[in-house]
Every structure is written in structure tokens, then in C-alpha cells.
A protein has these predicted regions:
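Residue-level signature of catalytic and energy-coupling elements of molecular machines
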Residues: 61, 131, 226
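Mid-length scaffold segments of soluble, non-membrane domains
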Residues: 98-169
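Metal- and O2-centered redox machinery and metal/ROS homeostasis
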Residues: 39-42, 51-54, 193, 197, ...
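Bacterial Sec-dependent N-terminal signal peptides
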Residues: 1-24
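N-terminal Sec/ER secretory leader and immediately downstream segment
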Residues: 23-105
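Second-shell loop/turn segments in exported
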Residues: 39-51, 94-95, 104-113, 123-124, ...
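An amphipathic alpha-helical core segment
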Residues: 165-206, 211
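A cross-kingdom marker for long, charged
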Residues: 25-32, 207-243
């Protein structure tokens, strides 16, 4: 009886070991397959995939923010008075000029929306000209790594080309005139410190910030939702993150 029990126990142990070995083989096979898939991608493949993701993101961003209330109706990118004008804003609201302040802020946002309509070609030119270094590092980085890389590499270029458009839209909707109404009233209050921020620069950079917010949104979609990978290169490149 004891010999039978020992024999049975040995069989159970043997089966358990065999099961564990088979499980390890399956896991090992999956890991190996993952490694093989990753090694099939070249640096150029990844660059092409990142470029396409940024292109799609730019199209999405421009469409989103250039619509009416694209900036003004989106809290995450709505343009408020420059920080150095916060005291002025608070003071004027207290003495009954809230609507005037709101009108000015709305005009800044509308200027950004109108300028964004012409931003796509500028963004696509920037994407085309940027040199993507460490493509695999960007691919395997944060959810907005490609967007942040593009921002770092192209903000000065975007600012240079977008600013004249912003100046034009500011003129069309009289942003400066609305600003003058605020500052004239505020500067007439005794003991206030006069302020004169560069609104053209400010609105241009805020326009760029808003565009990049939504480029990042689309990059996140492509990274995390297979259905957002609408081409073979996007599928091949971004499926690597799924392992």
C-alpha cells in the first residue's frame, strides 16, 4: 500500500512538473514572438509611423481648435488674460467690468481659432522637416512622447510662421482695441501699475499650445486603440507597444 502511494505521488509530481514546463514554453514562445516582431521594425519604419501619427494628430488638432469655440469653449486650452494682467482682471471685475473682460478674452480665443485654420500646412511642413532621432525611444516612451518631441523641435519655427497670421486675425476682430478699453480703465485707477504685455506673442504661443494639446490626444488614441491605427505602417509600428 505504501509503495502504491509513493508511486502515485511521484506520478502527480511528474505531471505537475510537465505542466509547469509546458506553461513556461508557452510564455517563452510569446516572449520570443514579441522579440521577433520588434526586431522586424527598422529605425526608418518607426520614423515613418511616428511621422504619420503626428500628421494625423495635426489634422485632428486643426479641425478641433479652428472651429467656432474650439478654444473659447474648451477649458483646457481657453486663453485667459496674461498672468501679469490677472490683478487688472480681478480689479475690473470687482468694479463692474466683467462683461468687458469676458469680451476681451473671447476675442483672443477667436483670434486663435481663426489663425488655426491656416496652421495645418505649417505643422505639416514642420513634421516633414524635423529629424526624428532615437525613434525607438520615442515609440516606447510616454503616451505623448512624439508630440513633445515635435513641440521641442519645431516651436520656434511654428511661432515664426504663425505669428503673422495671428496678428492678422487679431486685427480683424479688434483684439487690441478691446485690450485698450481695459487698460485705459485700469490705468485710470490711482496707484495701479501699468501693464503692457506683448499680446501678439502671447496669443501666438497659446495657439501653438492648444494645437499640441490635441495632437497629443490623437497620439494617445493611436497608441492605445488599435482601431485608430488606420494604415499598415501605424499598425506595424504601434502594435509593438501591445506586448
Amino acid at each position: 500500500m505504501q509503495r502504491f502511494f509513493i508511486t502515485a505521488l511521484a506520478c502527480v509530481i511528474c505531471l505537475n512538473v510537465t505542466s509547469q514546463v509546458n506553461l513556461l514554453k508557452k510564455i517563452g514562445g510569446k516572449v520570443q514572438n514579441s522579440i521577433q516582431i520588434k526586431t522586424k521594425l527598422s529605425e526608418d519604419d518607426v520614423k515613418q509611423g511616428l511621422t504619420e501619427a503626428l500628421t494625423i494628430g495635426s489634422q485632428f488638432a486643426v479641425n478641433k481648435v479652428s472651429s467656432e469655440n474650439g478654444f473659447n469653449g474648451t477649458p483646457s486650452i481657453r486663453i485667459l488674460v496674461p498672468s501679469e494682467a490677472n490683478r487688472m482682471k480681478e480689479t475690473l471685475i470687482k468694479i463692474g467690468f466683467k462683461q468687458t473682460v469676458d469680451d476681451f478674452e473671447s476675442s483672443m480665443n477667436r483670434a486663435a481659432e481663426l489663425a488655426s485654420k491656416d496652421a495645418l500646412d505649417i505643422l505639416l511642413t514642420a513634421i516633414k522637416n524635423v529629424t526624428i532621432k532615437d525613434a525607438f525611444y520615442i515609440l516606447n516612451g510616454e503616451q505623448n512622447s512624439a508630440t513633445e518631441y515635435l513641440r521641442q523641435e519645431t516651436t520656434d519655427f511654428l511661432h515664426q510662421l504663425l505669428k503673422p497670421i495671428v496678428i492678422s486675425t487679431m486685427s480683424d476682430i479688434e483684439v487690441a482695441k478691446k485690450w485698450d478699453v481695459l487698460t485705459t480703465k485700469y490705468n485710470s485707477i490711482p496707484f495701479t501699475k501699468k501693464i503692457n504685455p506683448d499680446l501678439e506673442d502671447y496669443i501666438t504661443y497659446k495657439t501653438i499650445d492648444g494645437l499640441f494639446v490635441f495632437i497629443a490626444v490623437q497620439e494617445n488614441e493611436i497608441r492605445n486603440k488599435p482601431l485608430a491605427r488606420t494604415s499598415e505602417i501605424l499598425k506595424n509600428v504601434f502594435e509593438n507597444q501591445d506586448f
